[in-house]
């Protein structure tokens, strides 16, 4: 069971704004409904020069050997805009990304990411600019992301970030919707008991 306490990984800088879900994973690869196997289609039209994935685009940053095992994506505002396809999140996770840092995200993409345990971090534009300058200067740089302390540590500098306390608690404990439902199962049963009791009394009264 994966509990997100902290993560240290190589950062890949993708200096593009308004990356939509069709760029993250094109629509022709959405035929499966399980979450496995979508990583090979991530940023397909940018990573490859042909539809059969035979010609790798040498200029796209994810194809650089330095970022082969990158697990943190640094990008710009409005990441994940466009259609609400959850496959976009699945492809990022399946590729190996654990954290995405940007100045803003699409609301639906943010929700889908939280539900799939992909940590999204929102920072001010000046912090994003600083981090881009840093990773472009020191190629292959790693960040440490502490969800407990809500901070990114790089080069002995701590950059704090905000996250909803409930979401942080769920990620730290690896709770999903089923887990949360089970935690209030006794309340649900009590509610059902009271409701059905009321309905039975009403039926008896009207019969």
Curated annotation (Swiss-Prot):
Pathway: Amino-acid biosynthesis; L-leucine biosynthesis; L-leucine from 3-methyl-2-oxobutanoate: step 2/4
Top EC class of this enzyme: lyase
Annotated transmembrane regions: none
UniProt keyword list: Amino-acid biosynthesis, Branched-chain amino acid biosynthesis, Leucine biosynthesis, Lyase, Plasmid
InterPro entries linked to this entry: 3-IsopropMal_deHydase_ssu, Aconitase/3IPM_dehydase_swvl, AconitaseA/IPMdHydase_ssu_swvl, IPMI_Swivel, LeuD
Pfam families, sorted: Aconitase_C (PF00694)
E.C. designation(s): 4.2.1.33
Catalytically driven reaction(s): (2R,3S)-3-isopropylmalate = (2S)-2-isopropylmalate
Highest taxon of the lineage: Bacteria
GO molecular function list: 3-isopropylmalate dehydratase activity
GO CC aspect terms: 3-isopropylmalate dehydratase complex
HAMAP family: LeuD_type1
Function: Catalyzes the isomerization between 2-isopropylmalate and 3-isopropylmalate, via the formation of 2-isopropylmaleate.
Quaternary context: Heterodimer of LeuC and LeuD.
Family according to the record: Belongs to the LeuD family. LeuD type 1 subfamily.
Protein name (record): 3-isopropylmalate dehydratase small subunit
Gene source species: Buchnera aphidicola subsp. Schizaphis graminum (strain Sg)
Taxon lineage: Bacteria, Pseudomonadati, Pseudomonadota, Gammaproteobacteria, Enterobacterales
């Amino acid at each position: 069971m994966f509990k997100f306490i902290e993560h240290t990984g190589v950062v890949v800088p993708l200096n593009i704004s308004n990356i939509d879900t069709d760029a993250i994973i094109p629509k022709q690869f959405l035929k499966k409904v399980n979450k496995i196997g979508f990583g090979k289609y991530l940023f397909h039209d940018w990573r490859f020069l042909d539809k059969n994935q035979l010609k790798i685009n040498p200029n796209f940053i994810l194809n650089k050997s330095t970022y082969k095992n990158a697990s943190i994506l640094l990008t710009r505002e409005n990441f994940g805009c466009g259609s609400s396809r959850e496959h976009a999140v699945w492809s990022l996770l399946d590729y190996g990304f654990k954290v995405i840092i940007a100045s803003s995200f699409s609301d639906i993409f943010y929700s889908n990411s939280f539900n799939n345990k992909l940590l999204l971090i929102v920072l001010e534009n000046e912090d994003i600019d600083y981090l881009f300058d840093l990773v472009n200067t020191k190629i292959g740089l790693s960040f440490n992301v502490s969800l407990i302390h809500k901070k990114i540590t790089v080069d002995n500098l701590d950059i704090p970030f905000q996250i909803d306390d409930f979401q942080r608690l769920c990620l730290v404990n690896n709770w999903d919707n089923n887990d949360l439902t089970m935690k209030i199962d006794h309340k649900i049963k009590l509610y059902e008991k009271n409701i059905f009791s009321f309905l039975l009394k009403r039926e008896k009264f009207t019969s």
